[in-house]
Amino acid sequence: SVGFKAGVKEYKLTYYTPEYETKDTDILAAFRVTPQPGVPPEEAGAAVAAESSTGTWTTVWTDGLTSLDRYKGRCYGIEPVPGEENQYIAYVAYPLDLFEEGSVTNMFTSIVGNVFGFKALRALRLEDLRIPTAYIKTFQGPPHGIQVERDKLNKYGRPLLGCTIKPKLGLSAKNYGRAVYECLRGGLDFTKDDETVTSQPFMRWRDRFLFRAEAIYKAQAEPGEIKGHYLNATAGTCEEMMKRAVFARELGIPIVMHDYLTGGFTANTSLAHYCRDNGLLLHIHRAMHAVIDRQKNHGMHFRLLAKALRMSGGDHIHAGTVVGKLEGERDITLGFVDLLRDDFIENDRSRGIYFTQDWVSLPGVIPVASGGIHVWHMPALTEIFGDDSVLQFGGGTLGHPWGNAPGAVANRVALEACVQARNEGRDLAAEGNEIIREASKWSPELAAACEIWKEIRFNFAAMDTLDPLKS
């Protein structure tokens, strides 16, 4: 019959289209779908496509006022997950017209909005997105990128060294500044506000900024190296955040920091635009990420949060360590590290990358390895992350038995030894401990660090692991 027909019909009749050929301009998504018992995988995949695009639970007469074929999401493929019962990877294509240009906020509101509470699904996880080049070109991306940062700092050929100041809460502004100065003069490139430090009663933000600036200028003058401190500009409102960034620029500080998930993508993108316009580097902390990404069958993988950050804008982002105290398998971590740094990444399921991604010269982001690392980890970190990284030792600097500056010296000596050994052709993975021992003969600071942390390990199985590849 002609006209509107009320009622409920199966999603798969409209949104499951295995014959669909994807377009270069489509946003492609890979969802890990766990249907409720009795729900066919095709219906579950189609439901995801519908609820994250144009669909609702019943037929509505206003469907006739638009072209659903033009705007609907389509589930174009489903494959079972090897080794899992009743779990599937559903591939969904979204037309580009569904998304506002230059808005990570709108992209995520559409793709991972209501659908994650859908009753027909027991669990749902977004594993990867292919962002088309046409959409990427609507984003500014990182304020500066890797090469511009190296040029600003005049530091080449090695990873950069950082340190989060501890205790993270409770220090006065002056004592915090003193700790910053000690670390920077000892040989670190950066120090960092803890992500929880904003403007609390024990240390208001303006005092914090002033004492950090004093520490940076004093520490730069002694060795003649450019230094930085990640001043956390995160605040309760966007206006307050921008006020703090403006003050950092007025003080001549080279880098500010933002907690991009708790602060939100809209605030982050605004800050990234300001940083590019005003010559500030932008360090990004990922506080709250594990709430979203740690469970294997529900939520969103961190590689998506990393891609979104590259689009929204940030020059550094925390990316796990592989060897420290925080979650992260080596292959998975290297997969999203490449997505952050490289211009073109081929799909590679052995590293969790579902789609080939072309960034069309969007600047890269430097991954930051931070969390439970110390001098014995330096060879592995240098080998895993390479030169374009920040290796950040908080307790691994401040916990040195002789104090902050000797802790910084120990880390710098260990790093320089590893870089020299690598450049001479030595195998860091096989000879790492020997390289550190040799260097410690010439550095009493490194020898003391080696002694105190020789037995420290964080040996726990990762929650988020790769699926077995199909034979």
From Swiss-Prot:
GO BP annotations listed: photorespiration; reductive pentose-phosphate cycle
Binding site for Mg(2+): 192, 194-195
N6-carboxylysine, modified sites: 192
Catalysed transformations (reactions): 2 (2R)-3-phosphoglycerate + 2 H(+) = D-ribulose 1,5-bisphosphate + CO2 + H2O; D-ribulose 1,5-bisphosphate + O2 = 2-phosphoglycolate + (2R)-3-phosphoglycerate + 2 H(+)
N6,N6,N6-trimethyllysine modified-residue sites: 5
Gene Ontology molecular functions: magnesium ion binding; monooxygenase activity; ribulose-bisphosphate carboxylase activity
Tree of life domain: Eukaryota
Sequence similarity: Belongs to the RuBisCO large chain family. Type I subfamily.
Annotated protein name in UniProt: Ribulose bisphosphate carboxylase large chain
Origin organism lineage: Eukaryota, Viridiplantae, Streptophyta, Embryophyta, Tracheophyta
